[in-house]
Amino acid sequence: MIIRARGFFLLMILLSFQHAIFGAEELKDGLYAKLETSRGEILLQLYHQRVPQTVANFVGLAEATKAWKDPISGKSKKTRFYDGLSFHRVIADFMIQGGDPLGTGSGGPGYRFQDEIHPDLKHSGPGILSMANAGPNTNGSQFFITHKATPWLDGKHSVFGKVIRGMETVNKIQKGDLIQTVSIIRRGKDAK
């Protein structure tokens, strides 16, 4: 009986440890992106049903299923776009920005796509994931995550997700910190 109790106790500890490290089993059905950065992990819920084009672009670049043009060589690539890029623009009490292969704010994937503004998705608080752009319909690969509500960006930038875990990491990010890797997590039949 004692051995069984110890075994059960050990199993519970291992399951708790796995849950603390991975945490993925607690996620509801949906599509998520896990950003592993040089400062820690950020888990984002992606709004794939409300802004499918924007989410598909981000996921395709993250998973190397979407081709992009290297801004230095000019060659087409199908590699994990975000891995190893830096947060090239960080403004305290506003946002962190990444997704530029040049690290200057002027780079992208070699193409642009239309804005996808959903009326229910607003820059309503900290942790909002949105597309950075250079004006209407100039989306590519650059994104930002807010530190606070930024309502003046509504209707100008496509919101496509939110931080559900790791806001403390967002708040620690400094200019030049790295996106080590981006992993996409799918839960449920609708998360394609």
Regions found by a protein language model. Give the residues of each.
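Cyclophilin-like peptidyl-prolyl cis-trans isomerases
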Residues: I2-I3, M12-K192
